[in-house]
Amino acid sequence: MRDSQNTAQTLTESLKYFLKYRDQTVVIKYGGNAMIDEKVKESILKDILLLKTVGIKVVLVHGGGPAIGELLEKYEQKSQFVQGLRVTDKKTAQLALTALAGKVNKSLVQDIIRLGGNAIGVSGIDGKLIEAKPISEDLGYVGEITAIHPEIIERINQTDAVPVIASAGIGLDGEIYNVNADTAASRIAGALSAEQFILLSDVRGLYGNFPDEESFIDEINLTNLEKLVKEKKITDGMIPKIEAIKYAMFEGLGQAVLLDGRVPHALLLELFTDKGQGTMINH
């Protein structure tokens, strides 16, 4: 009886958040170890289905996880790197698209349907969703995002399906480009003027002195975030994520959250409780 009362109390307390986010857009970037662990993946997808059920326009953007590397290895495509970026020839770009849109994307759509929901999978090349141009000749088919055309997402959001987006780009020349998934997700969030952008990662969020838990940052604005970057208190792997978030916020994004995707039901805890889970970044 007490457990039932606690559940009812929790649902009642969550009501204000259901109302806050109803009919609002929440973009979720999914990647890292959260894509590898099947239990974690199922927890995340169940959370997403609940968000959709209570009237939130959820957009799921994903990277390739280990699938791209596995496919390149299978076809004996060796990777070369210039300044930390993978040099991408035309064959590698095609294989990356196969892994992203053919394997990972359709697997996520299949899982969402298996769990009782509905989903439509598209890649960034569909409807010129993610328009890109080459960063440099040295990197080949590595793309810089030049525009987002979100109409295809907006049409899917008018249905009962969750749009699942594979982060590939297409140029005006019709060529396919490898684009950074964090950047793609944040640019999509900005283009949709999303209420919130949630970037799932493998850490809890931001720290003033990582990994000291006492220095964990619950909430920060852009000004103080810049100070952390200048003081080099943010690790190298987190900097591209921060830059992507900053750009999206200038484009119209409301708030962003860095969240540990490995925590069970992290999305629900972040969106529907007072305390939240990760680091919230606001204007």
From Swiss-Prot:
InterPro entries on file: AceGlu_kinase-like_sf, AcgluKinase_fam, ArgB, Asp/Glu/Uridylate_kinase, Glu/AcGlu_kinase, NAGK-C
Broad EC category: transferase
Listed Pfam families: AA_kinase
Chain positions recorded as substrate binding sites: G64, G65, R86, N178
Keyword Hydrolase: no
GO molecular function annotations of the record: acetylglutamate kinase activity; ATP binding
Main location: cytoplasm
Transmembrane segments: none
Protein name: Acetylglutamate kinase
Native species: Lactococcus lactis subsp. cremoris (strain MG1363)
